[in-house]
């Protein structure tokens, strides 16, 4: 096996791409735009929880899903994205693409967006990059506002509708992500969000605190209250973690919640006994 970045090549020629999850170190909503999207800014960081994507030559395009969070991907953005990329480039992509879904679905961890970015980036490189970076960003954002971030990963400030990305210095942290086994709908959470928000911190203050490595003291998620109103499991998880002395933060529009550091074995067992998933991760 050889490895280049997140691409592995197996002995039989099957390509394997590692598509990382992300967490939001805060999500601030500035208001709603005329086009229906929200203006936001957020600090996002990739973590070492991965979907594995297997790609090999095939007689036609086929996208399959396996793993603990597999589902029918015929209408998934990876399938639709490859078809659209094929139309734009005039190339047929006769590949069998198998996505091993290890990242929980509807968790606020960006799994589908990361998968899309990984596959389209790979296909673009196979064609010797007919799409330059901005074109690729625009293409990906037409499917998912999170997807452009995954072209580079690491740590970034995302703003606008989430499609504008400013790369930041990585933040080294151990975190534990807990998925309460409920698939939250991003559109449903954003659609239910009606509150007028006041920015507790200015963007300049957030960036300054990041430079001081003080990430824990800036995190705020304007969607958390709305998500809890829709999905009671998120609130139950947050209250449980608070009751045992941890400071939990919701990622994205939910449903996953994370804490900095590791949980005790006793707490992990208590969470898993409820059917919830616990992942010990590091930022990457």
Curated annotation (Swiss-Prot):
Extract the GO molecular function terms from the UniProt entry.
4-(cytidine 5'-diphospho)-2-C-methyl-D-erythritol kinase activity; ATP binding
Name the pathway it acts in: Isoprenoid biosynthesis; isopentenyl diphosphate biosynthesis via DXP pathway; isopentenyl diphosphate from 1-deoxy-D-xylulose 5-phosphate: step 3/6
Q: Which terms under GO biological process does the entry name?
A: isopentenyl diphosphate biosynthetic process, methylerythritol 4-phosphate pathway; terpenoid biosynthetic process
Reactions this protein catalyses: 4-CDP-2-C-methyl-D-erythritol + ATP = 4-CDP-2-C-methyl-D-erythritol 2-phosphate + ADP + H(+)
Binding-site residues for ATP, renumbered to this chain? 104-114
Q: Report keywords, A-Z.
A: ATP-binding, Isoprene biosynthesis, Kinase, Nucleotide-binding, Transferase
Return the SUPFAM superfamilies for the record.
GHMP Kinase, C-terminal domain, Ribosomal protein S5 domain 2-like
Q: Name one Pfam family in it.
A: GHMP_kinases_N
- Look up the EC number in the record and give it: 2.7.1.148
Q: Which family does it belong to?
A: Belongs to the GHMP kinase family. IspE subfamily.
Functional summary from the UniProt entry = Catalyzes the phosphorylation of the position 2 hydroxy group of 4-diphosphocytidyl-2C-methyl-D-erythritol.
Known HAMAP family for this protein?
A: IspE
Q: In its UniProt entry, what is this protein called?
A: 4-diphosphocytidyl-2-C-methyl-D-erythritol kinase
What broad taxonomic lineage does this protein's source fall under? Bacteria, Pseudomonadati, Aquificota, Aquificia, Aquificales
